[in-house]
């Protein structure tokens, strides 16, 4: 894999649409010499509808806005207490295929949860990471000009009830889970560094630098 410095941005709690636009701008403007970046963020409550999304999977959004997204997949929910990690990687330069990246992201979460004694696994029929039959992490990516954006959303200590207003990722009755069901002291503040360390390990430990925002 190509070795270079990865820039890491810890963005805190942000509106989904502003971060989505920033990802598009970054991807459109980057060139072959641009550093890859990883963005760690939480979002204000929002349902995002992926490219494959069908309106009937949004059951009763109520007061939570619904935003169209160009990531892969169907509808999901983002809210405070969910750690989102966006991966802005030059896949061509890192010699990664799209399937490779999906597997890498799933393994990042599996390894992170294993450190806390939580046994999790991906599913071939439904992308994401699961504990038993319950989904704890959602994935959605977009590739443009050989570069990835969007990423994963790991449920840490969030309110899961808004997921009842949708068919998560297009699956009616899909049960959702969060880390605090097994590890009560988990927060996004202590999960984000673990996620970052695990994805960097799977990328062969490139140097990285936190960028102030």
Swiss-Prot record:
Keywords: Acyltransferase, Cytoplasm, Transferase
One record GO biological process: protein modification process
Task performed by this protein: Catalyzes the transfer of endogenously produced octanoic acid from octanoyl-acyl-carrier-protein onto the lipoyl domains of lipoate-dependent enzymes. Lipoyl-ACP can also act as a substrate although octanoyl-ACP is likely to be the physiological substrate.
Main location: cytoplasm
Record's protein name: Octanoyltransferase
Site note Lowers pKa of active site Cys, residues: 135
Misc: In the reaction, the free carboxyl group of octanoic acid is attached via an amide linkage to the epsilon-amino group of a specific lysine residue of lipoyl domains of lipoate-dependent enzymes.
GO cellular component, one term: cytoplasm
Protein's cellular compartments: Cytoplasm
